[in-house]
Amino acid sequence: MENDPFLRQYQPSELKIASEFLTNWLPFLSKDLCKDCNHLLSNRIRSLDPAHCSNNTDKVDGECKTGSCSVVENMGSERASNNVDDNYDEKSENGEDCDNHSLGSWKGSEIVFGSFPEDFSSVLQSRPAVVETASPRMRWADMAQEDEFDEEEEEEEEERDSSRKGFDASSMKTPEKPKLSRDQRENLRLINVKRKKDFICLERVKGKIVNVLDGLELHTGVFSAVEQKRIVDQVYQLQEKGRRGELKKRTFTAPHKWMRGKGRETIQFGCCYNYAPDRAGNPPGILQREEVDPLPHLFKVIIRKLIKWHVLPPTCVPDSCIVNIYDEGDCIPPHIDNHDFLRPFCTISFLSECDILFGSNLKVEGPGDFSGSYSIPLPVGSVLVLNGNGADVAKHCVPAVPTKRISITFRKMDESKRPVWFTPEPDLQGIEPLPLDLNRSGSTSRFSRLNNHNGTNQRGHGRRGGGNGYDSRGYYNPERSSEHNDSGDWPSSQRRGMPRPSRRNYG
């Protein structure tokens, strides 16, 4: 045993602990073995402890010769091992008490399932490579649609695995778990995305009762925690570049925080957007002669995922975005997005959950404090799609956030409003949604006319693509029985479109 390449990786004290531990587990390990195999296994476990080994001339099934193997004598756990061996052999021959040897059910042994010696626990922690499988697990399977991310993560994982492994893993015959292909993993995540599209808030607009939230969609489960971390890290890197003056002048904006709610930093890509008339007299909208940086590569990866995963239609692929970096107390006042941008558009939330208020008549109660008819919590990693009345009739705002937050809003510019220097991104052309698993829905009629979205790309609420019509044409229809039953998630007052009983204090 002392020449075994596997055992050479361990200290004598560790082998002793392993020997004692496995001796206690011997009844389970030797279950259903014949006496000779049981005896061979017992001797092999005992031989793990070199401090108590002695040369022995006994042979076990002809495997051990004089001086070639050792049997541990006078071990502290010898008595317990022999007892369970005798008891096991006697009962197994009689066909009795077989179930008593399942994990955690040994009545005659001292060990209790779930309890490990402290020394042995430390050994396990110090030897993580021993219990790992030989094949590395891809940490970036979540970004399955992007080959470059998969390859990068595979290389990193292989380097970490190779540095941890101190032995030839191929010598261990560990059964491999069945692997899913990248397409299978992506499809599994795709069909598990939750999509809420039945927001209702009835308000009187121009003398008519309308659902001002018609067209809103909330998609959760689109971005994994790993993907979110990578995106947030990228945003902070861009923020540092902006602060160092390494981005174009109008790309990064960091206003002086002169009052509560006025310190939000922004990063714009694809176009420069003016929220209000500026000092030069430019009206709100896209500034066609102001130059900003193009979309970063990772942001284009996000856009492709939004299209492929049926969050945005392929007829409205975003070509610009704005990143909002909130500090505690920052906010966005009530507004309707300028119609220089087409509908639908979307915003993704990172770092922390916050509420977004909707209503045709939002009120400013104080710095960063607003009230409205309907409040929607935006979970971390969620995507809120604005279309129809939800984009053009109801205003929206973000009250002062209680903690740090990042949001990225992706929008497609009207071609007539694009900057004079703008060039469409080649890798954002011809993106198609991934096929959906029709068997999961139980009805193919829900997915009819999958790519019929020509009505969604309109400017203004007078000619908009039409809220839930976007869903009814079959772009994506989740399992309504589970994902649209929101009685436990949304207060009844919100479902009826009534104001909340009390206004939340965002201070």
UniProtKB/Swiss-Prot annotation:
Residues 145-160 have a biased composition (Acidic residues). Fe cation binds at residues 335, 337, 396. It catalyses: an N(6)-methyladenosine in mRNA + 2-oxoglutarate + O2 = an adenosine in mRNA + formaldehyde + succinate + CO2. Residues 89-100, 174-183 have a biased composition (Basic and acidic residues). Residues 440-450 have a biased composition (Polar residues). Binds 1 Fe(2+) ion per subunit. One of its GO terms (cellular component) is plasmodesma. Gene3D superfamilies: Alpha-ketoglutarate-dependent dioxygenase AlkB-like (2.60.120.590). Residues 317-414 form the Fe2OG dioxygenase domain. Its cofactor is Fe(2+). It is found in: Cytoplasm, P-body; Cytoplasmic granule. It comes from the Eukaryota. One of its GO terms (biological process) is mRNA catabolic process. Its main location: cytoplasm. 2-oxoglutarate binds at residue 405. Keywords: Cytoplasm, Dioxygenase, Host-virus interaction, Iron, Metal-binding, Oxidoreductase. Residues 76-102, 145-183, 432-507 are annotated as: Disordered. InterPro entries: AlkB-like, AlkB-like_sf, ALKBH9B/ALKBH10B-like, Oxoglu/Fe-dep_dioxygenase_dom. Its EC number is 1.14.11.53. PROSITE patterns: FE2OG_OXY. Belongs to the alkB family. Dioxygenase that demethylates RNA by oxidative demethylation: specifically demethylates N(6)-methyladenosine (m6A) RNA, the most prevalent internal modification of messenger RNA (mRNA) in higher eukaryotes. Modulates viral infection of the alfalfa mosaic virus (AMV) and the m6A abundance in its genomic RNAs. This is RNA demethylase ALKBH9B.
